[in-house]
Structure formats: C-alpha cells, structure tokens
Regions:
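Noncatalytic, typically N-terminal accessory segments of nucleic acid-processing enzymes
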Residues: 1-253
Length: 253
C-alpha cells in the first residue's frame, strides 16, 4: 500500500430538533487510491482496491474533444440520468463527492448510478477523491458546503488531466472533459484550464445527438446564486465518513 496522511475534518451537523453541533473527525488520506485507468492499475495501485480497472485506452467517441474520459458533477446525475444511461456514455469518472451528494438527495437515482458503476461494460469508475492525497481538499471557512463540493469535483478533473498528460502512452486517452449543468462550475473549470461543457453541449458531439436530446432534462445549465451550488442539505459529510469506514480509508476514533 501507499503512504497515509491525516487531516481533521470540521463540519456542523443539525440534530433532529434543529440544534447545530460542531463535529470533528480525523480522516486518513492515501496516495494509492486507484484511478481506474487500465493502463496504469498494476502493482501497488491495484493492491489498494479489489475492483478491476475499467477506463480503457480509447475513451469516448465524441466530437466535443479528442479521445477523452469525462468527469460528471452532481447536477448531471440528478437531472440527466436518462441521458447518462444511454450506451454511448462509457469511460465515465464519478467522484466520490458526487456519489455522496446523490445518495443524500435521491436514493432511486443513487441506485441507478450504482447500477452503472457495477456494469463493467459501461466503464463507469467511482474515484475516492475525498481520500486521495492528491485530490482531497479542505473546506475553506468562507465557502458553503456546495461550493466546496464543486471545487472538489474540479480538483478531481484537474488531477486526472495532469496524470493523463504526464503518464499516458502514445495513442492513449490524454484529455478530460468535465460535464456540468452548473454555469458557475463550467466557468471556473474553464478558467482553471479544463475542457468543460454542459450536458446539452456535450451530447451534440455524438452521432445520435438528436435521439439523446429527446432524453435531455429541461434543467440544463442552470444559473444559481453564489454559495448555493445545488440547494442541497449540508449532510453529505456523514455519508462521506461512513463510505470511508466501509472502504477502509477512514477509521472510527
């Protein structure tokens, strides 16, 4: 296994009666969290996880960008699942942050996401970004949980992009596309140098774009007030911690 670091996670949690409690948890961050890329998952990387890597060398065929993988955000799962379930979507990276948020918002959608993640032919990969030393971020005091989560998703996309550029062999995928229906998130990602677009923009790159557009939700590329990325309740941390306990990357104390 790889090295382990620790960090203290601070957050506030509401009780059933509405009382706000300050909670501190120590998390353990690892440098061997598998990224799911078939070409790289050997030796030490593979030892950290019992899942077989699924992200292949050819990536997705879509004219939006050269061969690529996509990273999706929470809005895409919540509002565009019908599109996401289309067979043209393969080689999709799902940050742990996204899975946690979806689980807290909609168990039916979370179960549909888990089905995609469990279908190796679809090549969806759950990446534990909250426990990877290279992608885990702290929660800034002046940002909302939702803004923090958006930043975590962008950090995941940025890390994958850097890894592909540095490590990908010839004729291998070298590009990441962040697909988000949040205007602010797309803008910030582009400012950071990432290729980012809305789901509507993205599906125009498929040969069957017309059919996919029929599945598209009207809730695409939404504007939002600053500090309120999704209007989600701020309960995601508990799920994050429980997921970490199950994964063995967070230890109860």
């Amino acid at each position: 296994g790889g090295g382990v670091g620790d960090a203290t996670v601070r957050f506030h949690r509401k009780t059933a009666r509405g009382k706000v409690l300050k909670v501190l948890r120590e998390t353990y961050r690892r440098d061997d969290v598998p990224c799911g890329v078939v070409a790289w998952e050997t030796g030490a990387d593979a030892d950290a996880d019992d899942r077989a890597p699924v992200l292949d060398a050819s990536g997705i065929v879509n004219s939006t960008a050269s061969a690529h993988y996509i990273v999706i955000d929470t809005n895409v799962v919540l509002h565009q699942m019908d599109v996401l379930e289309s067979p043209v979507f393969t080689n999709v990276i799902v940050p742990q942050t996204v899975a946690n948020e979806v689980r807290n918002r909609s168990m039916p959608l979370y179960n549909r996401l888990r089905t995609l993640l469990g279908d190796t032919d679809r090549r969806f990969w759950l990446f534990y970004n909250e426990f990877c030393a290279s992608t885990a971020i702290t929660h800034d005091a002046d940002e909302s949980i939702n803004d923090r989560n958006d930043r975590a998703i962008r950090a995941t996309a940025t890390w994958y992009q850097a890894q592909l550029r540095a490590r990908a062999p010839t004729q291998h995928v070298r590009t990441i596309v962040l697909v988000s229906d949040d205007v602010a998130c797309v803008h910030r990602a582009r400012t950071d140098g990432l290729h980012a677009c809305s789901m509507r923009e993205y599906i125009r790159g498929f040969a069957n774009a017309t059919q996919l557009e029929e599945l598209l939700s009207a809730r695409t590329l939404e504007e939002r007030p600053s500090g309120d990325a999704h209007g989600f309740d701020e309960y995601w941390e508990t799920e994050q911690l429980e997921a970490g306990v199950r994964a063995g990357t967070v230890h109860r104390g």
